[in-house]
């Protein structure tokens, strides 16, 4: 369960703003009841960590993220300890490097050593990275030992399957969390998009026809596309209220035939055949 909405207004289809504390409690109670055992947060998500600490998160595994390395290693470590304080816990299941570009910073090696010390001291169970592109995943696989990775993945974005990165991560026993399975809500609502998205109208229409033919809702299709991808260990979803989480949980038990998005034609899939 993502928690950015608990600390900030977030998402292209979020019309309600930041989630009220009482609703946060309802969401977490329902999540716990349904076996959702992991919360994803970050110091940069407004006051999300403080909200979670106030409500109580001892029944959940927590994934949080680093602050900017620009302020120095000591400050990043101090911010992590502040996260523990704000969350009202003594350790986290995972700490992700939030800005992947910082691996190129000359201070990064020093930070990574310090994080591994925190892991030895059992303040962190898994160290990992939040990524955005296949190239970043390739770079990490080539250069670092790590336990956990967060990647973008959805029915429109299967680059990590097509490029073999998901399989490579699994071969190294790295835990994979997928975010953006609803593409910030876009995959759930095509009716209220701004002009910026008009260039993809044809693709959106075609996708909606496919979903309609499957007799599933947009939510069911997008969610189960990710859930049926075996290389993914966890799917990260964010909600604004408990009813949305109820819808997601109720939509998560449907088997979906995923062949509808694969086009089995090598002359299309391999550019070497293009003329």
PLM region spans:
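A short, structured active-site edge motif that brings together acidic residues
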Residues: 59-72, 94-98
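Short, acidic/polar
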Residues: 16-30, 72-87, 133-139, 222
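Acidic (Asp/Glu)-rich catalytic clusters
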Residues: 52-61, 81-90, 140-144, 168-171
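Active-site groove signature of glycoside hydrolases
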Residues: 85-103
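Active-site mouth loops of central-metabolism enzymes
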Residues: 9-22, 65-74, 104
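N-terminal binding-site loop/beta-alpha segment at the start of enzyme catalytic domains
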Residues: 1-60
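Beta/alpha (TIM)-barrel catalytic core signal, keyed to glycine-rich beta->alpha loops juxtaposed to Asp/Glu
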Residues: 100-268, 274
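A structural motif
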Residues: 33-36, 89-92, 124, 146, ...
